[in-house]
Design a protein with these regions (language model features):
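N-terminal intrinsically disordered, cationic/polar leader segments
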Residues: 1-47, 58-82
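Acidic, glycine-enriched active-site microenvironments
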Residues: 52
């Protein structure tokens, strides 16, 4: 797998998880509760997926889809919890 694309996916997913409070902010060491912020990073992953369609290896595409699905589950759970 190309480390560059994986690094971008991980970077965006990590920021989404930080904004959803699933990972502590590495600077403040506090859990955030910013679902709007998380949505921005999730949307960026959607853009990445659409712009790279047909140009990713099978492994890269599967990784991106898995990360997106996991983020969707966490995001929807947070939204439902209110």
């Amino acid at each position: 797998m190309d480390k560059d694309i994986k690094a971008i996916i991980i970077l965006l997913a990590t920021q989404a998880m930080i904004n959803m409070g699933e990972i502590q902010d590495p600077i403040t060491h506090e859990a955030k509760d910013d679902l709007d912020g998380a949505a921005v990073f999730i949307e960026l992953l959607d853009i990445l997926e659409s712009k790279t369609q047909g140009n990713l290896t099978t492994e890269e595409e599967a990784f991106l889809i898995e990360v997106r699905e996991n983020l969707d589950q966490v995001y929807n759970k947070k939204i439902s919890a209110g």
